[in-house]
């Protein structure tokens, strides 16, 4: 009886095989929908890749291919990103339906509160990367070589840089939420972070190096500046929470 009363409301004891079967069924749904969406997006993927690169890369830069499968891989990546974006509500729904029976009411409330903020921060980070960081990065890095040679970039490598920047900065923008949660959960004190700013900035620079491996160090400095601003915003928020 004690064991039953400790279960979350609405939860039913299931064997490992039943859990795995349910997980398999939900994964099949998500994978099938993702593949169908990729097939639907593929005819438009070349135009989407071109549109994505057109804003991020200066207009005087020539985008070309250096391998037979390069453009095809870029189109597949675009299809996958588009499918995940369009099918994201289904992904969230299936994940929540799988996990919900094992969650207590206060854990569900926590997810309802935190997840929207996390999603908004990720989108904000991606937008900053795409509309601010990437154009600035390409303009400065490519601009230094204009006197020597006309720039021609690989479509595959350039598209990979764009997607890595957008996804990486989206994840980096989770820093304020992580810091606020860590302080609220008592894992770290606000005063400790305030007094150890230099150490925190060093850690943030390490994160910037990881998410934007650029030999010029320019992109790392941009990401570090954004992270420093987010850290200070977090410190202000925790003062009132």
UniProtKB/Swiss-Prot annotation:
The keyword Chloroplast does not apply. It comes from the Archaea. Its main location: membrane. Keywords: Cell membrane, Membrane, Protein transport, Translocation, Transmembrane, Transmembrane helix, Transport. GO terms for molecular function: proton motive force dependent protein transmembrane transporter activity. GO terms for cellular component: TAT protein transport complex. It is a multi-pass membrane protein. InterPro entries: TatC (IPR002033). The chain crosses the membrane at residues 27-47, 76-96, 122-142, 161-181, 193-213, 217-237. It is found in: Cell membrane. GO terms for biological process: intracellular protein transmembrane transport; protein transport by the Tat complex. Forms a complex with TatA. Part of the twin-arginine translocation (Tat) system that transports large folded proteins containing a characteristic twin-arginine motif in their signal peptide across membranes. Belongs to the TatC family. NCBIfam families: tatC (TIGR00945). This is Sec-independent protein translocase protein TatC. It comes from Methanocella arvoryzae (strain DSM 22066 / NBRC 105507 / MRE50). The gene is tatC.
């Amino acid at each position: 009886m004690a064991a039953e009363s400790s279960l979350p409301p609405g939860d039913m004891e299931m064997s490992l095989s039943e859990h795995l079967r349910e997980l398999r069924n939900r994964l099949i749904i998500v994978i099938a929908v993702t593949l169908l969406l990729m097939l639907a997006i593929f005819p438009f993927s070349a135009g989407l890749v071109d549109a994505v690169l057109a804003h991020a890369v200066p207009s005087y830069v020539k985008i070309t291919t250096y391998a037979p499968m390069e453009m095809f891989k870029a189109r597949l990546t675009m299809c996958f990103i588009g499918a995940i974006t369009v099918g994201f509500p289904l992904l969230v729904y299936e994940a929540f339906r799988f996990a919900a029976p094992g969650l207590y009411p206060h854990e569900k409330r926590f997810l309802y509160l935190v997840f929207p903020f996390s999603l908004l921060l990720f989108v904000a980070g991606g937008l900053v990367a795409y509309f601010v960081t990437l154009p600035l990065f390409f303009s400065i890095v490519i601009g230094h070589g204009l006197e020597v040679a006309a720039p021609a970039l690989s479509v595959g490598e350039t598209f990979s840089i764009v997607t890595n920047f957008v996804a990486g900065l989206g994840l980096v923008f989770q820093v304020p939420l992580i810091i606020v949660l860590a302080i609220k959960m008592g894992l770290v004190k606000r005063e400790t972070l305030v007094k150890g700013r230099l150490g925190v900035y060093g850690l943030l620079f390490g994160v910037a190096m990881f998410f934007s491996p650029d030999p010029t160090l320019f992109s790392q400095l941009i990401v570090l500046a954004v992270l420093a601003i987010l850290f200070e915003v977090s410190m202000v928020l925790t003062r009132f929470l």
